[in-house]
């Protein structure tokens, strides 16, 4: 068994990943912005504080490219340098589906830095999380019974964060997929009317999809206290959703985990309490 660092351990993917790795017998060190504890180190990617301490004795690592920022390549360079110096056996980096489309984009520049580092790696690029519907898009659902997004009839192959964690748990501990990148999707592509119907069925309430403008989405994100730069970034990438870039389906989850991805209807049943407020 290995000593594995999880950067982003308190997040939507990080939490189930930690549980899975511990269940497999690995020693997990959680890196978060919180105060250190018995199995937790404090790490600030913006200042670089705690990077050297976090990697002490580490053999393998999962690294979440930090959300809420637009300079992930700059923030992650010291992480890759420390991992290289420590001789890590594997580093799994999570960015986002489509991150490799533009070589000048911060996500892609971070990926390239890892690819060229000499560290055995995997890059995973998940599509839009199913869990966005019980977080980012939750307010409109519980207050108005509506999914409010500027996406029209476009479809997305939404992925459950638990599947992302399952993939990461396999990749970080194995070498047979070394130095490969994977786009991660669910097993079906749904439009937001279909999503609304699934949520309605799971909750026995009426939930509808309402197409809105980009400006309305931005206003809602800012009202939810998201940083302006990140809110604007979300509006931009949702524009790609509307253009159909989130519809493709891959077999990566099944290839790596040996099972089919979680269906949206199952996600809706598992999280139904989130929308019953």
Provide a role label for each language-model segment.
Residues 2-30, 38, 46-49, 56-59, ...:
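Oxidoreductase cofactor-interface core, primarily capturing Rossmann-like NAD(P)-dependent enzymes
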Residues 16, 215-277:
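A hydrophobic C-terminal alpha-helical subdomain
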């Amino acid at each position: 068994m290995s000593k594995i660092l999880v950067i982003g351990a308190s997040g939507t993917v990080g939490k189930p990943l930690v549980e899975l790795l511990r269940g497999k017998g690995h020693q997990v060190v959680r890196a978060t912005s919180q105060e250190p504890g018995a199995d937790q180190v404090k790490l600030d990617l913006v200042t670089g504080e705690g990077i050297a301490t976090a990697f002490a004795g580490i053999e393998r690592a999962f690294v979440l490219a930090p959300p809420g920022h637009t300079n992930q390549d700059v923030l992650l360079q010291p992480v890759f340098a420390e991992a290289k110096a420590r001789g890590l056996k594997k580093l799994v980096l999570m960015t986002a589906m489509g991150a490799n489309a533009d070589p000048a984009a911060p996500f892609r520049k971070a990926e390239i830095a890892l690819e060229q580092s000499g560290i055995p790696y995997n890059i995973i690029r998940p599509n839009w999380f199913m869990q966005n519907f019980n977080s980012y898009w939750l307010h409109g659902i519980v207050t108005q019974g509506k999914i409010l997004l500027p996406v029209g009839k476009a479809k997305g192959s939404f992925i459950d964060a638990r599947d992302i964690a399952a993939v990461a748990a396999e990749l970080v501990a194995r070498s047979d997929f070394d130095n490969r990148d994977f786009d991660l999707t669910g097993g079906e592509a749904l439009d937001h009317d279909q999503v609304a119907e699934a949520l309605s069925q799971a909750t026995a309430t009426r939930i509808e999809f309402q197409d809105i403008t980009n400006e309305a989405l931005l206003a809602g994100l800012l009202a939810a206290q998201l940083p302006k730069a990140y809110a604007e970034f979300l509006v931009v990438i949702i524009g790609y959703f509307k253009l159909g870039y989130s519809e493709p389906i891959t077999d990566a989850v099944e290839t790596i985990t040996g099972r089919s991805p979680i269906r949206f209807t199952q996600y809706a049943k598992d999280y139904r309490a989130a929308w019953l407020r």
